[in-house]
Curated annotation (Swiss-Prot):
SUPFAM superfamilies: Inorganic pyrophosphatase (SSF50324). Signal peptide: none annotated. It catalyses: diphosphate + H2O = 2 phosphate + H(+). It is found in: Cytoplasm. The modification N-acetylserine is found at S2. Mg(2+) 1 binds at D116, D121, D153. Its EC number is 3.6.1.1. This is Inorganic pyrophosphatase. It comes from the Eukaryota. GO terms for cellular component: cytoplasm.
Length: 289
């Protein structure tokens, strides 16, 4: 959306790579805390972390100052999601709704599990392949309750408000009708995507059924309330950085110069990306249970 821009630091697909967000004044901001949850009435902001069809597991760095987007790392190795046949990378634009938080200290009444300590995830199903760090306005359509290694990990289904077909989508049943097979593929993808890494299949609440728009919005609002408690230090942040530039009631609000100092301490932008390992293109075949 207009008003937000990105600035890369270091080379893409490197351990040092970061994507910082800026506001309309060119000042650095946190995509987690400073971008409003709402873009308009009944329209939510979404921070795109992973463009559709790509494999690099990019995410908001919740524990880093200003929460830039970076590639997830495990045992000093950059993480890429596997291509689990018949899928290529992520099958939607994947990201998060800002100013939300799935509280690891809160036992969700629907799933019986605590939150995963991240902003709530979004799968954007429109036709455009978005850019990493792009901020879009989305219409929420429904939600899936995934249980990831014993933690609640909600997956919001939404569509870009700028999509030419957005007016035709108003609830989860419209996705079933207009994109047959997409929701079933979404469940299958989330169920099995960690199997190539040697992990078990993920589980779901509600027998892997998608809940409707109203249910989804209620869940988003509850995660927004948890975020408010987080950013105002009324709850334990579990190591999360709440440094921000706009939340007046937050004790961790900083001025633009302090935010700039965080970015200036990092390596400069790099025109060329690092080489992506060739095995990222490998296709994995796994028998469905």
């Amino acid at each position: 959306m207009s008003g937000f821009s990105t600035e890369e630091r270091a080379a893409p697909f490197s351990l040092e790579y970061r994507v910082f967000l800026k506001n309309e004044k060119g000042q650095y901001i946190s995509p987690f805390h400073d971008i409003p949850i709402y873009a308009d009435k009944d329209v939510f902001h979404m921070v795109v972390e992973v463009p559709r069809w790509s494999n690099a597991k990019m995410e908001i760095a919740t524990k880093d100052p200003l929460n830039p987007i970076k590639q997830d790392v495990k045992k000093r190795k950059l993480r890429y999601v596997a291509n689990l046949f018949p899928y290529k990378g992520y099958i939607w634009n994947y990201g998060a709704i800002p100013q939300t938080w799935e509280d690891p200290g809160h036992n969700d009444k629907h799933t019986g599990c605590c939150g995963d300590n991240d902003p709530i995830d979004v799968c954007e199903i429109g036709s455009k392949v978005c850019a990493r760090g792009e901020i879009i306005g989305v219409k929420v359509l429904g939600i899936l309750a995934m249980i990831d290694e014993g933690e609640t990990d909600w997956k919001v289904i939404a569509i870009n408000m700028d999509d030419p077909d957005a007016a035709n989508y108003n609830d989860i049943n419209d996705v079933k009708r207009l994109k047959p097979g997409y929701l079933e593929a979404t469940v299958d993808w989330f169920r099995r995507y960690k199997v190539p890494d040697g992990k078990p299949e993920n589980e779901f609440a509600f027998n892997a059924e998608f809940k409707d728009k109203d249910f989804a919005i209620d869940i988003i609002k509850s995660t927004h309330d948890h975020w408010k408690a987080l950013v105002t230090k009324k709850t334990n942040g579990k190591g999360i950085s709440c440094m921000n530039t706009t939340v007046s009631e937050s004790p961790l609000k900083c001025d633009p110069d302090a935010a700039r100092a965080i970015v200036d301490a990092l390596p400069p932008p790099c025109e060329s990306a690092c080489t992506v390992p060739t095995d990222v293109d490998k296709w994995f075949h796994h028998q469905k249970n």
